[in-house]
Amino acid sequence: MKKATSILLLLALVATLACALVACNPADEEWYVEDGAEVINVYLRDFEEWSNNYTIDAIRRFNSNLTDGIQVEYTLLLADQYENKVQSDREAGKAPDVYLISYGNLLTAINYNYILPLENVLSQKMIDDISESAKDYVYLKEHLYAAPFCFEPSIMLFYSKKAFATAGVTSAPKTYAEMLDACAKIKPTLSKAQYVVGTPKGLPMGWANIGQFYNAAGGNLPLSDDWSESLVMQNKEGYTSFLNYYTSLYTKGYTPLQDCAGGYNEIIREVCEGRAAMTFAGSYAVSTIYDEYPECVDDIEVAVVPTMDGTSNVATTTNGGWSYVLDAATAKRKGADGRTHAELAAKFLEFLLTDSEVAPEYFEKANYCKSAGYNSVIAATGKEGEGNKYYAEIARAASNAIATPLYNYDITTECSKMIEEMVINGKSADQVITTFDNMVKQIIRQSGLAGKNPAYRGN
């Protein structure tokens, strides 16, 4: 049985308005409750509406087994509240059994012993099913610490063919110069209520642009592979070119200073609803186009983001995404039958992430703009994705993408601060790069990062 769409939409709406939806059991007969079952608490993070609905329905389907002794209850939290809620509940001794962590934040959770190694709780079948590429993200310090959920290029360029044609722009810009030239042509054709290009603001300004900074620096992150020294000044020329180009989008009035409604997760709506001619967005924007704006599919195209020299078969984005983890305390929490919460939660994760009917459905609903971390799910969804008009370009970006860095997120925050300082405070690229270099050195020193990269294998 499938839950009525209206009920699922109502659940998502209530969650958004209330900021958290705790153990929500709809009144109809389709929400299953097993009397006497051990409750496993899951914290869900607010994503796209279709994604929230999928996960809530998957929980409902898992709970339809009224003999396994497991009852999954969830709390749906807004994105900007998620990490603080997990942290505060952990400190209060009320951490959820299961929650989501982005791949770039796994190492911090491991270092603080927040999460449980999974080798002894997940089934061997599920462990063997993890794809080779996904293993690089979830195996750290010689242990499996997370169950991969999805992978997705963090930034692509989506654009309206109609808006481009009106302005005489014949193709997607490949270089910084072409991008600025296209913006200059498009701006005079727009009304006062429209703007040229959407860009990530706030926190996403950092993580969404990691790949662009990496590309500008000639394929280098801001610090050495062993995390012992800053590489910022070695790559000053590339950073300067990127920063001057990117901040021009603001200073020339091509992108607004304020964020759009819904933030970076929903920024594709700006193009779909005619407020912007193009936008940077994660690959997941494809699903919003297909599901909510099918009339825009013919008009909106996608391309790899511009690079300094126009080379597109290189890394321009991170393969971002999310994994499910078990709180360390789940190994000690036990139900009446003696099974630990870790054992019970593992049953749910296996169902959610690898069940032959449930898991592929997520990527179908995503319109194949994301990739799975399990061989069985990849095999079940790969061919269908080739019929998606956006699939080839997104797959190209994903194949060249880098993993989200494992070092302190403070460094990524400092990257976005360079942009902010130039746009808001009028500082030069030279000034902000010098400050960035000093901050990277300070973070390396204060956090003791030198030699601590778990992925470093030597020269």
Give, region by region, the residue ranges found by the protein language model:
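Conserved N-terminal structural module of periplasmic/extracytoplasmic solute-binding proteins
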Residues: 6, 18-108, 126-127, 309-311, ...
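Extracytoplasmic "Venus flytrap"/periplasmic binding protein-like
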Residues: 61-132, 137-139, 162-174, 270, ...
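Extracytoplasmic/periplasmic solute-binding protein
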Residues: 140-149, 155, 180-231, 247, ...
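A structural signal for short loop-to-beta-strand junctions that line the ligand-binding cleft
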Residues: 89, 94-97, 126-164, 311-319, ...
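Extracytoplasmic/periplasmic substrate-recognition and gating elements
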Residues: 167, 251-252, 291-367, 399
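Long, aromatic- and glycine/proline-rich binding clefts that accommodate carbohydrate-like moieties
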Residues: 24, 300-305, 362-421, 449-459
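Hinge/lid segment of periplasmic solute-binding proteins
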Residues: 101-155, 180, 191, 209, ...
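Glycine-centered hinge/linker elements that transmit conformational signals in sensory
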Residues: 183-184, 228-261
